[in-house]
């Protein structure tokens, strides 16, 4: 029996093909990055050992690729000390087949590079006047608000048409929402929660600034919403017939301030440091004194232990008596934040 002779040529050919494959794979493999910085370098590593085709298949405009397949130490030095990876190749050179998502369009910038910019569809907007946003700011129109939402505030919505107001007068809230004036005298449209669970503990009772005991924070918020302006929290627990602040126990580092107008005390935060800013607007307080800012007024109240409220902005001599009467009923609260009013 004659055995076939071993042919080394076949094994060499196999090894040659394997080496060629490894070389091709090594040449194609690189690093995929999520963005190219202004300095031209790749930043935010997405994945290693990817070909350019694999990296750029994500369709993201900012995705970039580097050909060099380097070790982890080099990658670390690039990202920490060098501002990114060199020889950065952007996946997209034009706006062709670029999907920027809703409210955005791809446009070539001055450097002839594709960029996604905010371009909301405003064709169906019927109201052309100013609108008040959920952030309490007035926008010249709804389209301007949509651009602001696209850029930095994804939760921003129109709460009512017209400029943001300090009173619920002439505010028309959409749907079933109700206008509420918060403790900073800003009007907001909120939806009143008309169903509150019954309290399960006596620790849930709260005393409002109106001298009424509420079963829980939910009941206080509900009353605030239905009333249309801030009630505010005086202190935790049921309301008591206190003769002075000595009868009231404040928690959470708060201090009791006595309201001589109604003969009640309320717990207020007194650890606020007033900034040295010349841009602060002076306020006229309930003691008919003018303070450099609302913060300065609160500081004086905490120092004296007597509650002070803002009657109006500006000097006490800079506004008519009619306007004072209109704003006299607005209740000021130091310790009941706006988020507590609006979270239903």
Swiss-Prot record:
TB domain: residues covered: 30-103
Signal peptide range: 1-29
SUPFAM superfamilies, per database record: Kazal-type serine protease inhibitors, TB module/8-cys domain
Keyword Glycoprotein: yes
Gene Ontology molecular function: any one: activin binding
Entry's localization field: Secreted; Nucleus, Nucleolus
UniProt-listed PANTHER family: FOLLISTATIN, ISOFORM A-RELATED (PTHR10913:SF45), FOLLISTATIN-RELATED (PTHR10913)
Function: Multifunctional regulatory protein whose primary function is to antagonize members of the transforming growth factor beta (TGF-beta) superfamily including activin, myostatin, GDF11 or bone morphogenetic proteins (BMPs). Mechanistically, binds to these ligands in the extracellular space, blocking their type II receptor-binding site to inhibit downstream signaling. Plays an essential role in muscle fiber formation and growth both by preventing the repressive effects of myostatin and through SMAD3/AKT/mTOR signaling independently of myostatin.
Protein's name according to its UniProt entry: Follistatin
Gene designation: FST
């Amino acid at each position: 029996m004659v055995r076939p002779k071993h042919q080394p040529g076949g094994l060499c050919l196999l090894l040659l093909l394997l080496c060629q494959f490894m070389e091709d794979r090594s040449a194609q493999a690189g690093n995929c990055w999520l963005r190219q910085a202004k300095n031209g370098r790749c930043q935010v590593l997405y994945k290693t050992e990817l070909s350019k085709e694999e990296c750029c298949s994500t369709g993201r405009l900012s995705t970039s690729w580097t050909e060099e397949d380097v070790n982890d130490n080099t990658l670390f030095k690039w990202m920490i000390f060098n501002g990114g990876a060199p020889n950065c190749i952007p996946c997209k050179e034009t706006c062709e087949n670029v999907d920027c998502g809703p409210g955005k369009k791809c446009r070539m910038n001055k450097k002839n590079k594709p960029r996604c910019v905010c371009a909301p569809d405003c064709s169906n907007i019927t109201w052309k006047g100013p609108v008040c946003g959920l952030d309490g700011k007035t926008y010249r129109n709804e389209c301007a608000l949509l651009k602001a939402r696209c850029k930095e505030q994804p939760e921003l919505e129109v709460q009512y048409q017209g400029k943001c107001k300090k009173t619920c007068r002439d505010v028309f809230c959409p749907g079933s929402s109700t206008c509420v004036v918060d403790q900073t005298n800003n009007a907001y449209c909120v939806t009143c929660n008309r169903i509150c669970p019954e309290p399960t503990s006596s620790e849930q009772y709260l005393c409002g600034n109106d001298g009424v005991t509420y079963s829980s924070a939910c009941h206080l918020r509900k009353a605030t919403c239905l009333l249309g302006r801030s009630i505010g929290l005086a202190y935790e627990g049921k309301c008591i017939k206190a003769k002075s602040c000595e009868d009231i126990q404040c928690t959470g580092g708060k201090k009791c301030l006595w309201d001589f107008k109604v003969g009640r005390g309320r717990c207020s935060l007194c650890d606020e440091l007033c900034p040295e800013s010349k841009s602060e607007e002076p306020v006229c307080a309930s003691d008919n004194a003018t303070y450099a800012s609302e913060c300065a007024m609160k500081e004086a109240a905490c120092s004296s232990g007597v509650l002070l409220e803002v009657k109006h902005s500006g000097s006490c001599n800079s506004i008519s008596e009619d306007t004072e009467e209109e704003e006299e009923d607005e209740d000021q609260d130091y310790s009941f934040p706006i988020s507590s009013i609006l979270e239903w």
